[in-house]
């Protein structure tokens, strides 16, 4: 969410500067691996005049946070959505689930012309996260089925237990 890269974040003061901006929202008495408290780390945060990669709470990029926590029948213990990357029209959606049981299952079926899927359905990829796949592969990207893409579908609700980068 924003125009900057991680290197800009680093040069703007990095995690210590971000924690300084969070202030009372974090436990500043917690100890780090070095034995310092977060309060001590924050006190030593570099102040970089003119940087705009790390913004204050009073000057956010968006009025709502980039991330949100979801709860419901698909995620009874909670899930995370990067709502800043989601199409606003899809943030509230009801649809039929089209479930892929693994990355291999998805790869074999997602572009099959016989796949029973519509633009209003929800694509679900299971068993690709830390428990279902070895390690934590970046396997969370679910492509739009080709038969829908050919009709102009550019986005639809896609859910995965896998790690995703960027969006």
Task: Give the positions of each predicted feature.
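Catalytic or ion-coupling anion/metal-binding cores of large enzyme and transporter domains
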Residues: 1-167
């Amino acid at each position: 969410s924003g125009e900057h890269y991680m290197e800009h974040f680093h040069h703007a003061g990095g995690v210590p500067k971000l924690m300084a901006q969070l202030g009372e929202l974090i436990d500043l008495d917690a100890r780090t691996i070095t034995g310092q408290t977060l309060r001590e780390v924050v006190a030593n945060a570099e102040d970089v005049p003119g940087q705009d990669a790390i913004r204050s709470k009073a000057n956010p990029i968006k009025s709502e946070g980039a991330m949100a926590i979801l709860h419901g029948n698909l995620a009874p213990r909670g899930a995370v959505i990067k709502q800043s990357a989601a199409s606003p029209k899809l943030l509230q959606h009801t649809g039929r689930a089209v479930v892929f049981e693994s990355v291999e299952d998805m790869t074999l079926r997602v572009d099959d012309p016989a796949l029973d899927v519509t633009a209003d359905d929800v694509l679900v990829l299971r068993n690709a996260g830390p428990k279902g796949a070895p390690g934590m592969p970046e396997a969370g990207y679910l492509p739009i089925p080709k038969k829908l893409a050919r009709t102009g579908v550019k986005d639809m609700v896609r859910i995965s237990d896998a790690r995703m980068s960027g969006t």
